[in-house]
């Protein structure tokens, strides 16, 4: 399967965008923000997602600096923690297996990007 996401690079950082990923529902910029703000280089995120996919745990709740991810076997919902103060940032829903692929791609790119700085 060809990946439909893209990386946008700046001098000191990069982001992952999902404009062409039809399987991501809702505000796709929420997924972008979650990766950039909360996942960053934390490979443990993959372990939490794997545990849910493999049914080691029924679901998981990942609370970060600005986002909450509700990981379930089929779908994961990501919400901005301050939705009440900034209602323009809406939640998004991602198939959990796809989220695993996205997080892995993000972490690999993150490592390569900052290793080359």
Predicted regions and their residues:
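Extended charged/polar low-complexity repeat regions
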Residues: 106-109
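Short acidic DE-rich linear segments
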Residues: 111-117
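Amphipathic protein-protein interaction modules
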Residues: 47-104
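Negatively charged, low-complexity tracts enriched in Asp/Glu with abundant Ser/Thr
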Residues: 2-58
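Detector for Asparagine
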Residues: 3, 8, 65-68, 86, ...
